[in-house]
Amino acid sequence: MEYEITDQRREYLNARGFTILTACPGSGKTTSIVYKLKTLIEECRINNSNGTGVLCMSFTNKACEEISSKYKEMHGRSIDYPNEVRTIDSFITQYVVLRYWYLIEGLSKPIIINEDEILHNLFFHKYNGGEYLPYALREYNDLAHSYKPEKVEYIGHNIFKIENTIVSKDNDIRLFNYCNAILHYRLTHGALKSSDAMLVASNILKKHFVVAQSLANRFPYVILDEAQDTSYHQFEILELLKDAGLSNLELVGDVNQSVYEWRNARPEIFQQYNEKEEWNHLILMENRRSVQRIIDFYSRLKPIGYPNIVSYGVDDANIQIEIIRYDNGQERMAFDRFCEICEGYNLKSRLVLVRGKTDLTKLAAFRTSIKPWKSEIPYRIIDAELLFVQNKIKEALEKMGWICAYLIYGDGHFSEMKNYLKERGNTIEFNIMLLKLLKSMPPLSLSFNRWDESMRLLLRNGLNITEDLDFKFKQRMKGYNMNRLRNQSVDTYFGQVEENVVTAQTIHSAKGASVDAVLLYLHDRSGAQVISFNDLPDNSNGLAEIKEKHRLIYVACSRAKQLLTIAIPSTITENQIRRKLNGLDFHISSRGVQMVLNL
């Protein structure tokens, strides 16, 4: 893997101490981190005692796997002990909470449970067809069904959040006491959400300086990628490590790409680090993904004073931004027009993006349907895996439960399967086992051969099945060379984003993607849970206040390399579009619209 060292990159590679790196979309920040890691690992080996290493963190397992695989590709070896690549949740949980939980009075030995369905069963007891809180919480039965206990999260400063409701002593004392009781119940039973674990870790490090000091000594170099998605308590933990002697800390991210405020991300705290004098403030503003006209479009959504982003080394196919107007109920027309443009320019990889899951129901998914296995099991497994990736945890667990019961009992034993699921389906142990299977599933990027083999091995080990499993891959299938198909990746036919095939997905699920073409659906009216044409700025001066809706559009548009297409209802007139997008290079398509008003 080649890595070009420009002036901006060189400045980052040479930086030590406390560094804030603001990296635009397509800047190659992950590649830069990977390049720098080798140098830091060598420095750490020379300058520090045995057993100390570099810690590189990000927010998802997928991001960590990307860092690890790129490191091996670039440097010819894996990152090994004493160096680590982990999610920030995993690091804090493993190195602080699970090691030192006993230092917190009243806390039971914890397990981390982020699945609402399992936490729900911890709180609610079923009786006579109803659900009731345990005796210790019975006084809050009236609140529990409106404000589900599994949704209660402590976010700092004596403030709780229940989905979109903020709760404090000042605005509702009884609801605040309910939240406190729920948190206390989780802690005393050792069933912690990730946000609970961050709170526990913060308290451990505050009260026991020696623990923070030992971690600062163990990892004298720390890099946090996607730092804009860090929560209040995670920032607090990093500061506690810094106070305990951590000498090298890098926060790498882009405040414009923070789209996880609903998961307690605090992008404004990340932004505040740019005002701290003891930190190095560096930038990567060379975009190696998108052509300049696309950059100019989404740059309108960045804050005032944010550095200019420049397309760097990208071949331009000279495709205008396409604004497609469609009549209500004719979303498919916009999709067809998008595909037509892509075919004309031979753009293979594509994304169709919407704000949320409710919009997905309006858009059909188009994929090539094949059935290479005789058994139904692998198709159900893939369905479960895709549901899990889409954060549809309950549906994924239900599907995996059925799969496990079937594999244990086989055909013709429906009553045994039903009893098995009835007895175990609501137990924490069974659901944790299912989650472990879902989290350990081989990626759909593997070939059919490798995925089939890896999945059968996982199921045999996970379910303690002694017999060999056989999904019965077909020997013949009309129109396909089966030997060639065996070596193709599963996600060519079953994945979220496929070559020449497009399925609609949410912007959140596409974060980190890089494709030839993007189609983004916007609404014509503003609303709490939608992004609309009205959310686009009228000029390129930058925004005084950047909101999550702006960041969502920014992230969606910045996935595109050559073609950006915006689909909007025909209630938005062509003249409104021209006024809004004045100064940008775009084309309006109103083909098929019943009435074109130019007001």
Regions found by a protein language model. Name each.
Residues E2-P25, W279-E286, I304-L353:
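Inter-lobe coupling/hinge region of RecA-like P-loop helicase motors
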Residues E105-R186, G412-R460:
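Coupling/switch/interface segments within P-loop NTPase motor domains and analogous charged loops
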Residues G329-K474:
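Conserved helicase/translocase motor-coupling segment
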Residues M1-P25, T31-S32, G53, N128-P220, ...:
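Accessory N-terminal region flanking or inserted into the helicase ATPase core
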Residues A517, H523-L599:
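C-terminal accessory regions
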Residues M1-L103, Q213, Q505, A510, ...:
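P-loop NTPase Walker
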Residues Q257-R263, Q271-Y312:
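Conserved coupling/interface region of RecA-like P-loop/ASCE motor cores
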Residues D229, H233-F270:
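Signature of the SF2 helicase/ATPase Hel1-core->accessory helical subdomain module
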